[in-house]
Amino acid sequence: NKLFEQGILKQQEFSVPVVVVGNIAMGGTGKTPHVEYIVEALMEKYNIGVLSRGYKRSTKGFVLASQQSRPEDIGDESYQIYRKFGPEITVAVCEKRVDGINRMLEINPKINLILLDDAFQHRYVKPSVSIVLTEHNRPVFKDSLLPYGRLRESRGALNRADIVIVTKCPPDMKPMQYRIFEENLNLFPFQKLYFSRYNYGHLVPVFPDAVENVPSFDSLDPGTPLLVVTGVANPKPFVRYLRRRKAKVKLKRFGDHHNFSSSDMVEIEKE
């Protein structure tokens, strides 16, 4: 960071706006849902390109998402984004973001907005706007640097952000709670602070032909037993959501971005 701030290491600036969505804590703040939210809000006005590293993919270098892409090729997050928005936007992965942006613009010169997923620490790209996420239940001002805590860099890194979003907020936040975040984050006047929360969608059957009536979350009877299988960094907000609906939740937790195997399926069936 010091080398970039002193101009010893150079940042690449691009002719199109580049919006960075990231965090300063390890995993679980909701970067990909917020990227999808931005895509949905802006895709009618812009030709959008989304670029990420492609976490846990088996490939290397630049890979452009296509109908033939698998999660193993481009990472599960990029795969999810492409499945949702498909050919209406350009999705690619590349470890070197400068190279990735250049390749995307070569392939599709109509792109006039780039979204970088999880690139706040990748400073070789000069962002037009930097958006940093911090989780409501574990905000940066209550966290510590690795390895004691989860912070990738110090709280002072927030000074580079244009926008800070407190994610996964409860639906019943009180005005005083908003004020606590404002005071503890202590942002500069030029920085904007927002708060977001999840609205969980409807249940989608894994095997549609085997299910006649898909229940909704709201239709769950008190005490309904649910086996919840997760492969995300922090499943607690979702589990709390289900328990508020009086469901009897049994959690089967796998690691973030877990690649499910046949033996996992056998283990789940035993539950």
Q: For the regions a protein language model found, what residue spans apply to each?
A:
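Walker A (P-loop) phosphate-binding motif
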Residues: 5-67, 170-172
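Rossmann-fold NAD(P)-dependent oxidoreductase module
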Residues: 37, 41, 117, 241
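Conserved beta-strand elements of the Class I
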Residues: 49-51, 132, 225-229
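C-terminal accessory "lid"/substrate-recognition subdomains
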Residues: 139-271
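Phosphate/Mg2+-binding loops and adjacent switch elements
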Residues: 54-189
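A generic structural signal for alpha->beta connector loops
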Residues: 15, 45, 88-89, 110, ...
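N-terminal leader/targeting and accessory segments in enzymes
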Residues: 1-16, 262-270
